[in-house]
Amino acid sequence: MTRSLKKNPFVAKHLLRKIEKLNTKAEKQIIITWSRAITGERRELNPRW
C-alpha cells in the first residue's frame, strides 16, 4: 500500500538530524543508509523480527 499524498514523506528522526546538520553547514554529502522503521504491531505479529 502506498503512502497517502496528504501526508508528508516519512523520514527517520536520526536521518533527519543528519540532513539538518548538513543543511546548516551548506555542505553536500552522500548519506548511505539502510534505515527501515518497523512498527511494534508488526513485530508482535511476526516474532522473527
From Swiss-Prot:
GO cellular component, one term: ribosome
GO biological process, one term: translation
InterPro entries from the UniProt entry: Ribosomal_uS19, Ribosomal_uS19_SF
Keywords assigned by UniProt, alphabetized: Chloroplast, Plastid, Ribonucleoprotein, Ribosomal protein, RNA-binding, rRNA-binding
Subcellular location(s) per record: Plastid, Chloroplast
Pfam families with a match to the protein in the record: Ribosomal_S19 (PF00203)
Family: Belongs to the universal ribosomal protein uS19 family.
Its job: Protein S19 forms a complex with S13 that binds strongly to the 16S ribosomal RNA.
MF GO annotations: rRNA binding; structural constituent of ribosome
Protein name, per record: Small ribosomal subunit protein uS19c
